[in-house]
Amino acid sequence: MRLYVVQMFYSSLKESGALVAEARNTVAALSKKDFVLMGFGEHTAAIAFASTEPEANMRAQFERIRGENFSLIAFEAAWIVGGSMSKEVSLWLERHQPSPFK
């Protein structure tokens, strides 16, 4: 299972709320509704999720989410990134981290 992060940048959440919701709904479908929403201030948010979907297929689904004063990047992240995240995100990552014994 791969760890993905979708990071969104916008001028205001009020203005871009529908696009953020569309990104969240796409993540929910890809992750079977198992994801963590992270806020990084009033102009950016990110969603971490695990999925078996290949990166190219996942990225293609997010490329269609576009809007004025809104941008989004989606990428595969390393499992090691969890140690520097909030407790909620670290616990979620720990639950999904692949076992080295499988």
Placement of each model-derived feature along the sequence:
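Short, low-complexity, polar/charged sequence segments that are solvent-exposed and flexible
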Residues: 24-29, 66-69, 91-95
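Short glycine-/aliphatic-rich beta-strand segments at the starts of folded cytosolic domains
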Residues: 1-12
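Short, intrinsically disordered low-complexity segments
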Residues: 29-71, 75-78
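Long, contiguous binding/interaction regions
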Residues: 17-25, 56, 60, 80, ...
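Short amphipathic alpha-helix segments
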Residues: 11-33
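Short, low-order "capping/linker" segments at domain edges
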Residues: 81-102
